[in-house]
Amino acid sequence: MIQAEPFEARLVAVRPLSPFVRELSFERADGKAFLFEAGQWVNLVLPLPGGEVKRAYSIASAPDGSPRFDLAVTRVEGGAGSEYLHRLEPGATLRAVGPHGLFTRDPGSPAPSLFVATGTGVTPLRSMLRASLRAGAAAHLWILFGARFEEDIIYRDELEALARGSDRIRYEITLSRGGPSWSGRRGYVQAHVPELYRELAGASGDPAPHVFICGLDRMVSLVRELARGELGVPRKHVHVERYD
């Protein structure tokens, strides 16, 4: 287990992922490698007018031994922390503490996995996917991503390209409020989990793929109960990360 430690983080790049989500790329200001496991998170210490606050963000990038790491931040109206981060420009520095978290996956594991996410819950799963590809693992990794509107989909082009480039990666999107032009899946993620889980078991030849679930608490609870109940997924094969 990598020990969490405090360090100064410098913002080096910003890019929009959706109308409300920005990717913030940081690096350790001391130039040391930022060591973490795919799926972990980091605390940022924000100097707000009312006093310092800590905000936790999952790491979207895969470990590569460099000082750099990426975070995806949703701007919440009236949310002082997210609005502060959305105003930051490259060159700004913040105190950070990390890495933290047990929501991890061995990048070299051949075990098939269904990744289920909504919103920025896809970020630690993106990290796991990229870490597995870097390790050359032969795992079937399927992603089910849920959003309200098409404009809310983040990392879409990247994940679609990865899926096109490998017969072991599948990327599915479902929209709860998709417009008339949307031709993909509709509804909430839990409506599609049973079908995809059973298909993954058949495609991989493994009767009990792992399930990694990340997003808001209610979705995580519903999918976890579905996996453990209707689908009979072994307890040790169900992994969750809940966002407030």
From Swiss-Prot:
TM region positions: none
Cofactor(s) annotated in UniProt: FAD
Positions bound to FAD: 55-58, 120
Classification via CDD domains: FNR_like
Domain FAD-binding FR-type positions: 4-106
Pfam families in UniProt: FAD_binding_6, NAD_binding_1
Superkingdom: Bacteria
Annotated GO MF terms: nucleotide binding; oxidoreductase activity
Keyword field: FAD, Flavoprotein, NADP, Nucleotide-binding, Oxidoreductase
EC number: 1.18.1.2
Catalyzed reaction equations: 2 reduced [4Fe-4S]-[ferredoxin] + NADP(+) + H(+) = 2 oxidized [4Fe-4S]-[ferredoxin] + NADPH
Function: Transports electrons between NADPH and ferredoxin. Can transfer electrons to ferredoxins Fdx2 and Fdx8. Prefers NADPH to NADH.
Similarity field: Belongs to the ferredoxin--NADP reductase type 1 family.
Protein name, as recorded: Ferredoxin--NADP reductase B
Biological source species: Sorangium cellulosum (strain So ce56) (Polyangium cellulosum (strain So ce56))
Organism ancestry: Bacteria, Pseudomonadati, Myxococcota, Polyangia, Polyangiales
